[in-house]
């Protein structure tokens, strides 16, 4: 049975539902209301499947999938709040729980709309990395991808429901967890997705982790975040802590945005794209090479002071000459952090990209 067919099979749905119920019992043992809320639709679905009415079965199946996605998201949010030791001590089978309800036809169509653009506008070895992960197949073997990911990269696969606030994202990187969205965009969002999804994370970020400079970049950024927190916690007033954390964090976020999210590289192959926002979006990728976009050499002092807009195609992009520049960038950023040079970075009304960080300033 194909994977996409299996996810619609009643017995398989019940298996995942049972696994989720066990997980929720483990994590929310003190919340009887949550357990009751889950048990009711689970029991309802099991009863409906015994009926002969195919229409009711189909309706119940889709209802159950929605319920499962809701509780998966609830579980992911809870996991984000755990410490590293708590996550490692978790007995939940996350390989099963993290599996998305996969639509093979949708995956194939989303992949097909990007492949010719990747051949034209991405470095050759990016396609090699995709192939190594098995991501160029019209059938995504999610468990094989997770296994290869954890064997060949410096990170553990960490499923999330979508957007992760920067302070949570960096905290996960520091603990060597790589957040990967479990939801996939629909065809009407093919060209441009406002929020990170499976296409953005799995196709735009994950393949690059086979390159040592990318792995080191992500690891270093997580480590720098820890230094920022230590620095902030030593400040006497909450107002100082908030201002300092905001300023340092927006500098880190902009470094991410203008490199691994929207970055270009110019080498012997010519100008190519490596940023996940470009790679995952046919509209963004085409815009970067066909339209009149300003491309500048990557300069740390410039990018940490430059605001960006995630909701429209980019008008200014930055280019590197080799991927070692990503590691060099983190070294320069750390020096600026140590010298106190990141404490007066203008926000330009970009506070929305720092949502939830105040919990670190208590």
Swiss-Prot record:
Keywords, ordered alphabetically: Iron, Metal-binding, Monooxygenase, Oxidoreductase
Xref: Pfam families: Biopterin_H
The enzyme's E.C. designation: 1.14.16.-
Gene3D superfamilies with a match to the protein in the record: Aromatic amino acid hydroxylase (1.10.800.10)
Co-factor binding details: Binds 1 Fe(2+) ion.
Molecular functions per Gene Ontology: iron ion binding; phenylalanine 4-monooxygenase activity
PROSITE patterns xref list: BH4_AAA_HYDROXYL_1, BH4_AAA_HYDROXYL_2
Disulfide bridge map: none
Cofactor: Fe(2+)
Binding-site list for Fe cation: 200, 205
PANTHER family tied to this protein: AROMATIC AMINO ACID HYDROXYLASE, PHENYLALANINE-4-HYDROXYLASE
Family in the record: Belongs to the biopterin-dependent aromatic amino acid hydroxylase family.
Protein name (database record): Probable aromatic amino acid hydroxylase
Organism: Chlamydia pneumoniae
